[in-house]
A protein has these predicted regions:
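Amphipathic, positively biased hydrophobic alpha-helical segments used for protein targeting
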Residues: 22-23, 696
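Bacterial N-terminal signal peptides
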Residues: 11-22
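Bacterial N-terminal signal peptides that target proteins for export
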Residues: 2-13
Length: 728
């Protein structure tokens, strides 16, 4: 279906109670500041919708408990009681619940505890033919009929089962703060996070050309992350110091995902090795266990002439030593040479330091300066890996293109700059700045990049009802010689490189291709905002931003990128009890990518084999709303409406040697209407009733998802999912 319609409705009625204050007589109340409140009620959801429930927890039709609270006690400042506590909770009846508790003695210590759940609902319209969902081994039913392409899957329909892709993140956090003698303070916190559920993964079997076959499958998630940090602080009158330590440990309960190959034998797969169905299996590693530790220092000192110097330094180490999997799960493939070691013994040592200066030496003048150093030393040892391509081919020798060396990339960054501003008129400042960044890298096409950025800004408030600012910058990034042969010489064995007799074939990527994070680039940026309040009841804001990236030395790759956005917002209070607002935002994003299709050196230099892609996004978003207070503020009415329209245009074209010579993809479109209205009535000081209603209507059209059945693509067994939709 070209357009999927989403209509989401939810309504909630709640009663807000004032907790302790509501049940104690006034004379019994302690002399404290108490603004506690409790909300109780119900969410009524009109229908099931994964899209509506994404992050909110309102994915199912029916009634859910609405429960929020914020209760606590803190004595008035002169009571002599230094105890305080606070308890908070939100969405307690939903899968997006959050709760926190704090307790402390002011000036002595405080402790806190926090719990949070975050649901992620990706799709409930997927289809799978695999058994064992949620486990690390996926198999096919005995009734499966294999083929070399999806068109021949004769038993596809009878093997299809519904598949929901979702996961839940749960976080438990705790922390403390302890005031010590001599202006010392000790703080710390700890977080334990779990992530369980499913995500979509590409399960590939094959090795080159047209023989790879892929199945989109459900990969199980069972992650645990432990993070902790602590710091000792000294807060002097003019000097502040801090010494800290932090640790992060990630664990994955699964080390791999194994799946049965639904495709029959394909040309290019190892003959006689049972690669195809039913004996063929594939296996991929899941994220490995790893850890990170860091020791840090920070401090600041106040100097004469209204000057302050601050800085920080950190030394860290990352480690990853999860066991390697065998090269292949297929026992009939020849893989006699094992990996060169049992694990990667991977490590990265980090060193970072920053020094900042902020000074106001004379009236109307400010000077800010900074220097930053960031070094990442990848200590992972290099080795030759005789990998088996996609569980489909016998292991090849040291002189083949299947013998690869890992590239432990390191970098060293040094940057510094300044900004100086002078108020040459009252409440009007002109500032200029300069920033220089140098990055040295290893095992990349460019050894060093240098970027110079020039900045200027004007900020002014010439009148009490007018405020404006405009900022602009120009950055020029240049690199040393682009060594396009670097991936070949660094990633392949000398034996293989030596077997290439034609110098024109000594490359892995096209010699004219430039990776955009290394390529020469000129970046222009302008942004501004104006705020007006011509009368007390009316405020108007206008802002805009434009960024243009020009990769003028890139023949192939990303050559141009541009982003434009503008917003106007207006707020009007015609009478004291009524506030209205309206706003509109437009965003435009463009990118140009040029490429070349080739399979040999002659084609790599043929411009008639060029292709291009031009993407352009248009996003229009508007909103209007009002809030009305009646009956001495006892009745509060609120209404909001938001409309958003997004279009993506994709234009492609090719040279004369390729077909088709010109073709545009269908536009990707979405339309969203969001209407929210609520009414709240205050029966008495500590009791209120509120009812709210939300209506959301979404239409979307994405050619890459809608209408793509599991067997639409001949070499890919898909999930057949739709764009998120809900129908009333």
């Amino acid at each position: 279906m070209a357009h999927e319609r989403v209509v989401r409705c939810a309504s909630g009625a709640l009663v807000a109670l004032a907790g302790l204050v509501a049940v104690l007589p006034a004379a019994a109340l302690p002399p404290e500041e108490n603004q506690s409140w409790v909300e109780l009620g119900a969410w009524v959801n009109s229908d099931d919708s994964y899209k509506f429930g994404d992050f909110t927890g309102l994915e199912e039709k029916g009634i859910s408990l609405l429960a929020n609270f914020d209760v606590g006690r803190r004595a008035v400042w002169d009571s002599g009681d230094v105890r305080w506590w606070r308890a908070q909770g939100q969405n307690l009846g939903l899968d997006s619940r959050w709760a926190r508790g704090d307790f402390g003695y002011q000036g002595l210590f405080d402790v806190w505890f926090e719990y949070e759940e975050i649901p992620k609902f990706q799709t409930d319209s997927a289809i799978t033919v695999f058994q064992g969902r949620g486990t690390d081994r996926l198999t096919l039913r005995p009734s499966w009929v294999a083929s070399s392409t999806t068109a021949g899957f004769g038993a596809l329909a009878e093997n299809e089962r519904d598949l929901d892709i979702e996961h839940m993140r749960r976080d438990v956090r705790a922390g403390f703060g302890l005031d010590l003698p001599a202006d010392l303070e000790w703080v710390g916190d700890y977080e334990y996070e779990t992530k369980k559920g499913l995500k979509v993964a590409a399960a590939l079997i094959g090795n080159t050309g047209g023989n790879p076959r892929t199945s989109l499958v459900a990969e199980p998630l069972d992650y645990q992350t432990n993070e902790g940090q602590t710091a000792l602080r000294w807060n002097g009158e003019r000097v502040q110091l801090q010494l800290g330590y932090e640790i992060s440990v990630f664990n994955d309960s699964n080390d791999s995902l194994t799946w049965q190959n639904p495709f029959s034998q394909v040309g290019g797969w190892q003959a006689g090795a049972g690669v195809g169905y039913p004996t063929g299996f594939g296996r991929k590693a899941t994220p490995p266990d790893n850890s990170f530790n860091q020791v840090s220092m920070a401090g600041g000192v106040d100097l004469p002439w209204n000057t302050r110097i601050s800085g920080d330094a950190a030394f860290g180490w990352m480690r990853q030593n999860a066991d390697f999997l065998p090269y292949t799960v297929n026992p009939l493939l020849d893989a006699a040479v094992p990996p060169p070691r049992g694990d990667a013994d991977a490590g990265i040592d980090t060193t970072a330091a920053t020094l900042r200066l902020a000074s106001r030496p004379i009236d109307h003048l400010r000077i800010d300066a900074n220097v930053r150093y960031d070094d990442r030393d990848n200590t992972t040892p290099r080795d030759v890996y005789l990998y088996v391509s996609g569980d489909s081919l016998d292991q090849q020798g040291i002189g083949s293109d299947r013998a690869r060396l890992n590239l432990p990339n390191s970098y060293q960054l040094v940057e510094g700059g300044f900004e100086a501003g002078y108020e040459f008129f009252e409440r009007t400042e002109l500032s200029v700045g300069y920033q220089r960044q140098e990055i040295e890298r290893t095992y990349t096409e460019v050894d060093q990049t240098t970027e110079n950025t020039y900045e200027a800004a004007l900020r002014s408030r010439p009148l009490s009802w007018l405020q404006a600012r405009v900022e602009g910058s120009y950055a020029d990034r240049n690199g040393t010689e682009y060594m396009y042969r670097s991936p070949l010489f660094g990633g392949f064995t000398p034996e293989y490189v030596g077997s290439i007799t034609d110098p024109d074939e000594l490359f892995e990527n096209n010699p004219l291709l430039r990776k955009n994070n290394f390529a020469d680039r000129k970046r222009s940026r302008v942004l501004g905002r104006i705020d007006l309040m011509p009368i007390d009841a009316l405020s108007i804001g206008l802002d805009g931003a434009w960024v243009d990236d020009d990769y003028d030395q890139s023949t192939l790759g990303l050559t141009q990128r541009e982003a434009l956005s503008s917003t106007i917002d207006l707020s009007w209070t015609p009478i004291e009890i009524l506030t209205t607002y309206v706003w509109f935002t437009y965003e435009n994003l463009k990118s140009d990518v040029d490429g070349r299709s080739f399979s040999n050196a002659a084609q790599a230099s043929d411009p008639e084999r060029d292709w291009f892609e031009r993407d352009e996004d248009h996003v229009y978003t508007a909103g209007v709303g009002a809030e009305l207070h009646l009956f001495d503020d006892r009745l509060r009415l609120r209404a909001d409406y938001v409309y958003s329209m997004a279009n993506t245009d994709i234009e492609v074209g090719t040279g004369e040697a390729l077909t088709p010579t010109s073709r545009n993809f269908p536009d990707v479109e979405s339309r969203l209407h969001d209407f929210n209205v609520s009414a709240e009535y205050q029966f008495r000081e500590n009791l209120a009733f509120r009812v709210s209603y939300l209506l959301e209507d979404l239409k979307s059209d994405d050619w890459a998802i809608n209408g793509v059945a599991p067997d639409t693509i001949s070499q890919v067994l898909g999930l057949g999912e739709d764009t998120p939709h809900y129908r009333n």
